[in-house]
A protein has these predicted regions:
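Short, charged surface segments at domain edges that flank catalytic/cofactor-binding sites
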Residues: 1-10, 89-93
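Histidine-centered nuclease catalytic patch
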Residues: 12-48
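Short Cys/His-centered divalent metal-binding micro-motifs
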Residues: 16-19, 47-75
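Short flanking/linker segments adjacent to small metal-binding domains or redox-active Cys/His motifs
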Residues: 80-117
């Protein structure tokens, strides 16, 4: 969903255009706070944005550049809220299925809107 949501935006880190034409896609859903160090933020949309693979994987996430891009996109207050969020979240299997279904629904809607443009 995040990759589709941000498809028309530049990379959150470097500002270069995203290119979906490459095999396997040329961009990922990158997380500002990694899912390894902050698994509780995995499904928080402010924490996830389209990011070129070069920035996400081989640039070690480019945290400083990501933060600067994030401030431009969502504002300093929301970035600081992400940075301060230490609230653990434990999802049940049913909650995870509901999240999956919600994101599938939203992705279908995005694709339909893009097809109608």
């Amino acid at each position: 969903f995040i990759r589709a949501r941000d498809a028309d935006k530049p990379c959150i880190c470097c500002g270069l255009p995203l290119s979906a034409g490459d095999v396997g896609g040329a961009y990922d859903c990158g997380h500002y706070r990694s899912t390894g160090s902050a698994p509780h933020l995995r499904f928080v949309e402010d924490n996830a944005h389209a990011q070129r693979k070069q920035c996400n994987r081989w640039g070690a996430g480019r945290a400083v550049d990501y933060r600067l891009g994030l401030i431009q996109r969502i504002g300093l207050e929301r970035v600081e809220a992400l940075e301060a969020d230490q609230e653990p979240r434990k999802y049940t299997a049913d909650e995870l299925k509901a999240l999956r279904d919600e994101y599938r629904r939203r992705l279908r809607k995005l694709r339909q809107e893009a097809a109608n443009v």
